[in-house]
């Protein structure tokens, strides 16, 4: 997938349309400060927990201080989930990796703080 591509090759055309509709809805909810209630409506508590865990997986993989097996023990995630995160991170566009580094690896910067 190229950095500017909106389509996910892993999804069908219809699923891509649904995905892009969700992304647009999420963007609008953020603009109107409704993202938390929207995500609570659309995602189960387990799904919200899983997303939080995936963010931590990406953060720790970028930090590079733990092996995938150590991450499995530390985060309680399956090795397949960690491996998928690692492979996705390797395939991510450089601009996204740089942005994630700024967001996730800045020790004093809380998530969501764009200042």
Swiss-Prot record:
DNA-binding region(s), chain positions: 68-91
Keyword annotations of the record: Cytoplasm, DNA-binding, Repressor, Transcription, Transcription regulation
Gene Ontology molecular function, alphabetical: DNA-binding transcription factor activity; sequence-specific DNA binding
InterPro entries: Trp_repress, Trp_repress_bac, Trp_repressor/repl_initiator, TrpR-like_sf
Function of the protein: This protein is an aporepressor. When complexed with L-tryptophan it binds the operator region of the trp operon (5'-ACTAGT-'3') and prevents the initiation of transcription. The complex also regulates trp repressor biosynthesis by binding to its regulatory region.
Family affiliation: Belongs to the TrpR family.
Protein name: Trp operon repressor
């Amino acid at each position: 997938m190229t950095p500017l591509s909106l389509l996910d090759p892993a999804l069908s055309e219809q699923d891509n349309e649904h995905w892009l509709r969700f992304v647009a809805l999420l963007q609008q909810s953020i603009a109107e400060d409704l993202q938390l209630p929207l995500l609570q409506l659309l995602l189960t508590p387990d799904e919200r927990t899983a997303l939080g865990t995936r963010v931590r997986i990406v953060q720790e993989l970028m930090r590079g201080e733990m092996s995938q097996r150590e991450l499995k023990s530390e985060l309680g995630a399956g090795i397949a989930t960690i491996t998928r995160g690692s492979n996705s991170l390797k395939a991510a566009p450089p601009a996204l990796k740089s942005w994630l580094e700024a967001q996730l690896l800045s020790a004093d910067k809380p998530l969501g703080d764009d200042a």
